[in-house]
């Protein structure tokens, strides 16, 4: 697959399974709430796809995840979602779709750059990139929606509100989940010949 986007039927099947996992986990069950903390498992198939099939598949899986998030923002009656969609639909659209698309692409790209030198390190870095880029682009999107975010912040500093109320523990939990599962992903890669 070097330099071209052609896939065998076995690879297409693998991509389809990961795509279905991303969509289903994002739509109905990828998040487990424990108190104020949400354990998000939807990024795992995205990372796995980026590592196994490359950056373009990572981007495809990220795009699918972002579209599901966008649909949830539009359809689910959550005050924050309603506010940002009503006030900043273009920025909301771009934030939802681009954050995971870019994260998936960069994860696969960095993995490909590092895998020949240090395979285990490549898996860890690729696994960490997705929640880091996803969260960074979410924060950037929120900063572009300052008026909407300020309305939800109830007088709190917008940056403090974003970091404490919207990001806080979830980023660290997503990062930990990805980094804990990285060795497992690495072992899976050794046995899967797709």
Model-derived segments and spans:
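Internal alpha-helical transmembrane segments of multi-pass membrane proteins
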Residues: 113-136
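Alpha-helical transmembrane segments and their cytosolic interface
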Residues: 1-19, 125, 139-142, 146, ...
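Residue-level signature of the transmembrane alpha-helical core
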Residues: 16, 20, 59, 63, ...
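Hydrophobic transmembrane alpha-helices
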Residues: 1-60
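Interfacial aromatic-anchored transmembrane helix boundaries in multi-pass membrane proteins
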Residues: 26-38, 64-105, 109
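Structural signal for the C-terminal ends of transmembrane alpha-helices
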Residues: 51-56, 109-115, 186-193
């Amino acid at each position: 697959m070097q330099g071209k986007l052609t896939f065998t039927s076995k690879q297409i099947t693998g991509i389809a399974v990961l795509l279905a996992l991303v969509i289903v986990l994002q739509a109905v069950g990828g998040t487990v709430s424990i108190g104020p903390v949400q354990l998000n498992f939807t990024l795992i198939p995205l990372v796995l796809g980026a590592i196994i099939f490359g950056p373009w598949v990572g981007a495809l899986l990220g795009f699918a995840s972002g579209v599901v998030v966008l649909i949830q923002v539009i359809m689910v009656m959550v005050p924050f979602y309603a506010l940002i969609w009503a006030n900043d639909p273009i920025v909301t659209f771009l934030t939802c779709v681009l954050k995971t698309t870019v994260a998936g692409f960069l994860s696969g790209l960095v993995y490909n750059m590092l895998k020949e030198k240090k395979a285990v390190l490549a898996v860890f870095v690729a696994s960490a990139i997705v929640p880091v880029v996803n969260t960074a682009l979410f924060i950037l999107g929120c900063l572009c929606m300052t008026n909407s975010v300020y309305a939800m912040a109830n007088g709190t500093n917008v940056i403090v509100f974003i970091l404490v109320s919207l990001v806080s523990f979830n980023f660290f939990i997503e990062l930990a989940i990805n980094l804990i599962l990285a060795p497992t992903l690495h072992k899976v890669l050794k046995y899967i010949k797709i």
